[in-house]
Amino acid sequence: MVQNRSLHHTYFIPVVLYVLLILDGFLINAFPGQFVSEEYILVPHLALFGFVLFSYYFPKQPMQLYAILFGLLFDSYYSGILGVYAVAFAVIVYFVKKMQRFLAENVFVLALLFIVAIVMVDSFVFGFYSLMDITQLDFSAFASERLGPTIVLNIVLFIVIYYPLFKLVGWMYD
C-alpha cells in the first residue's frame, strides 16, 4: 500500500485543503445560475473530497484536527452556524480512516467513499437545519432537489480533480 513508503511534504495537506475550501465558494459565486435554480441546488464538495482523499492515503496524519479547524472555517464563511461542518468533517475523517483498512486502494473505492461522504454530510446538515427550523424542505424534496444533483455535480468534479490530486499524493510520498 502507498502508506508504507516514507512521507514527505505533509505541509501541503492544509494548503491543498484551504485551496479546495476556497474553490468550493468560488464555483458557486462564479457560476451562480448554474448551481442554484428553482428546480435544484448543486453544492460542490471539493474540501470534503480533500478530507476523504487525504484521510484515505495519509491515515497517520492529524486529519481530525484539520477537519475541525477547516470545518470551523467553512462554517464561519459558508454556513454561519459554527460547528455543523466541523463535526461533519471530523466524522467523515473518522469514518474514512476506519473503512480504509478494509478497502482496496483504487479510484473506484475512493469515488464510492466520496459519494457516501457527501450523503452523510449533506444528510447530517439537513437534519440539523431541520431540527433548528432553518430549512423548510422535507426529506423527499431535499433528496431530489439538492442531494441527487449535488452527487452528480461532485462525480463530475471528482473526474476532473482526481488525477491532479492523486499525482500530488504520489509526490508527497517521494
Describe these PLM feature segments.
Residues 1-174:
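Terminal, non-globular segments
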